[in-house]
Amino acid sequence: MMLSEQRYLLNQEDKNASILLKELFDGFSYKIVMSTIEDSKTVFEICKENDLPISSTYKKIKKLKDLGLLFIDRIVINEKGKKVVFYKSKIQSVELILNKKQVLLQFKKNERNLPYSISQ
């Protein structure tokens, strides 16, 4: 899923928009996305900053990656030889527009250090 100035018209048939909206309003996912807008972070940094359990955070990060809301910014090898993954939000902001005719969900791409291609 590519995010730039992406819009979703919410209706019962549009499952993608409903899934994205549900996920973003989940307190857990919201904390993860907000935590990684400015800087990429490891799972441990995200957990510590937001007081989140590690196993649940890994599951949410996988789901957010699958939905195209997070990406792997970089992978480094630490002094113990272990791989450390840094995650970053693909979105800078979300706008929900409600009126009598429609419900519109609009994403603004996070321009900070995004990879050239964000269609993971």
Language model region names:
Residues 2-22:
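Short, Lys/Arg-enriched N-terminal segment that forms or immediately precedes the first helix
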Residues 17-26, 42, 73-98:
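Short, cationic-aromatic polyanion-contact patches
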Residues 36-39:
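Short helix-to-turn junction characteristic of helix-turn-helix DNA-binding domains
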Residues 45-49, 64:
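A short acidic, leucine-rich amphipathic alpha-helix
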Residues 91-120:
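Amphipathic alpha-helical dimerization/coiled-coil segments
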